[in-house]
Structure formats: structure tokens, C-alpha cells
Amino acid sequence: MTRPLVITDCDEVLMHMVVPFAEWVDAEHGVIFRIEDASFANALKRKECGTPLEAAEVWPLLDGFFRKEMVRQYPIPGALAAMPTIGADADIGVLTNGGPEHQQGRIEQLALHDFHAPVIGSRGGKGEPVRRLMEQYQPSVAVFIDDLAGHHQSVAEAAPDVWRLHLVGEPAIADKIAPSPYAHARIDDWKAAQHWILARLAENIPAPAREPV
């Protein structure tokens, strides 16, 4: 019998990202990151004049952070502590939008916190990567965890049998992000999230069909 599968994002689910990123761009690049939501659109502004950075300027900053500054990140409370208990009942994979080029860095980052799991660095919507993981693992039941609503929609469309948990572990942005209508639950506390995940694994049934949104 195949084991259940838990597919989790990393940034703002397992590890804090926007706060250490904001501190870094402020100190090293003279840029203020106004944390209003999980989007980077118009969030980065030059300290000296307040003008927003263009998209072409934002992505090199993100790339630089993930290449050299991931050591600044620190775990979301309760997240990594929950992994051994969840891992006793399910395989765990980390699916991050950091891109393939940052995949090894993410593996090493998590290993420093004694969490060892397969990591997939993807781009764009996570629906297709989740669908491929479902084909690869053939799990008895699967749970997907992410902080971004768009990824829940993508997974709902590409892999509707997967349970979807919307979790925003960063308090600075959690109350600014509305619950995704494509997720089965919104829980931002890992103690409660662990109970919800373990309950889905114990039930061992596919996610129900989604009501029209």
C-alpha cells in the first residue's frame, strides 16, 4: 500500500522570508520593502526618493537573496517541529518557486535545521508539478500546503484530489492575505495545522470535489 504524501511550500510556510528579505534590501541596497501582502508588485521602493522598483530590478534582488542570503531565514514557529510527526505517517516533499537553480541551496538550508526531504524548485503555478508528483508517488492521500492563493487555484485545477491547506506563517502579512477560496482550510498556526494534516492522513480519502467559486 502506498503512503500518503504531504507537499509543502517553504517560504512563509516552513521558513520566514519576507521579513529577512526586507531587512537585507534595506541594509544592503537602500530599498524599502513595504510588506502589504505576499506580492512583490510595487512593494519595493527606493529609500531616497520613494519610487517603486521596476520588475526587471526586483528579480535580481530575489535571485541574490536566494543565492547568498538564505542564511538570514529562520523557521516559522512549530513548522519544522511538526515534520517528524507528519513524516511518520507520510512522505514529505518541498515544492518551492525558488527555481531549479536554488534547489540545492534550499536542501542545504533545511538540512541545517535537521530537516531532510526532497526539494523541487519550480517556476509558475504549482498545479502541474503537484500533478507530476501524484503520478510519481501514487499516494493513498495527499495534502498540499502553501501561502499563496494562486497556487491553491493551480493545484485545484490540475490535481483536484489533493487536500489544500492555505497557511501563511508570517504574522506581518497573514492578516493582509484573504483565505483562498480554492483551499479546503486556512490555518496559520502550525500546532493547529499539524492536527488538521494528520486528520486528513488518518481519514485517507481524496479531497472532495470543489464547489464552484
Give short role names for the model-derived ranges.
Residues 127-131, 173-182, 196-198:
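Short, charged, surface-exposed secondary-structure boundary motifs
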Residues 1-58:
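Active-site neighborhood of HAD-like aspartate-dependent phosphohydrolases
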Residues 144-188:
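Acidic, Mg2+-coordinating phosphoryl-transfer loop and its flanking beta/alpha structural elements
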Residues 64-94, 101-107:
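Short, acidic loop-to-helix structural element flanking the phosphoryl-transfer center
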Residues 2, 88-90, 135-141:
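Glycine-rich phosphate-binding loop signature in dinucleotide/nucleotide-binding domains
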